[in-house]
Every structure is written in structure tokens, then in C-alpha cells.
């Protein structure tokens, strides 16, 4: 059985006080990779393997690091959020 994993950007945040204090460019602004509502559909088939290719560069490496274990679980058909979310196939990550 083959499974898919949909990733949806629920919202983005900018913490200007942290940017101003810690970044080399304090006016860097919001992340340029994602916008609220962006949706990505990942597949893992013999013809297409989005997981190991990080979606051919369409995904931020830092964000991928934060969610990849959940994506891998979903692509295998598993659920890791049993009794945590109202749908055990759904995960919300920051």
C-alpha cells in the first residue's frame, strides 16, 4: 500500500525583536520559503520519492529537519499522535 503526506502551512510568524537582536541582517523579515496556506503533497513511490529528495529543493532545510520524522511515519501509513490530536493522522509542528 502506498501513502501520501500533505503538509499545509497554517501560519507564519516574525519575531522582529529577536531578529533585531540576533541576526546579522536585523531587517531580514519573514521566512521567504513559506506563505500561509501553502500546501505540499508528498509521495513515496518507485517513480517519485519526495521524502529522500526533500521535494527537489522546494522545502526549507531547517523546516524539513523539524518535521521529517513525522512525514516519514505518514508515508509509511503510521500514526504517532494517538490520543493527542483529534485525528491521529494529523501532526502540528512549529
Predicted features and spans:
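Generic recognition of cysteine residues
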Residues: 5, 31-33, 60, 94
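A short beta-strand micro-motif
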Residues: 4-11
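Short, Lys/Arg- and Gly-enriched loop/turn segments at beta-strand edges
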Residues: 47-60
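Short, flexible N-terminal segments of the mature chain
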Residues: 20-48
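Short N-terminal binding/cap micro-motifs at the start of the first secondary-structure element
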Residues: 14-19
